[in-house]
Amino acid sequence: MTMTDPIADFLTRLRNANSAYHDEVTLPHSKIKANIAEILKSEGYISDYRTEDARVGKSLVVQLKYGPSRERSIAGLRRVSKPGLRVYAKSTNLPRVLGGLGVAIISTSSGLLTDRQAARSGVGGEVLAYVW
């Protein structure tokens, strides 16, 4: 069975592993998932990620990040633009997550960017997800 929304699957696996206090989560690899993981790492939501060769295809291993007393660094993840309802934003109307405390992941012509990077670059695009 083919997966209709691999980004939603990626976010759901992260959300479930985070709520179960797992140290890492393994999922099927794709370039867009690796780019999202890179954004999450640069924003401090995950500690690291790596690509491994599996028996069939590649897999992406994401190491989750917790505080000193095991408090979660990811409070929430939400998929915004879905295959059935695409959501786009202009550079002048980019969303702010929790008043700037969270991050919106935007797919632009310059690649995947955060809402702050897209505003600085003056580009808009498809709003993929919110992370806070």
Swiss-Prot record:
Entry annotated with the keyword Transmembrane helix: no
Subunit structure: Part of the 30S ribosomal subunit. Contacts proteins S5 and S12.
GO molecular function: rRNA binding; structural constituent of ribosome
Organism this protein belongs to: Mycobacterium sp. (strain KMS)
Domain of life: Bacteria
Keyword presence, Lipid metabolism: no
Main function: One of the primary rRNA binding proteins, it binds directly to 16S rRNA central domain where it helps coordinate assembly of the platform of the 30S subunit.
Assigned keywords, A-Z: Ribonucleoprotein, Ribosomal protein, RNA-binding, rRNA-binding
Family in the record: Belongs to the universal ribosomal protein uS8 family.
GO cellular component, one term: ribosome
Gene Ontology biological process terms, A to Z: translation
Protein name per its UniProtKB record: Small ribosomal subunit protein uS8
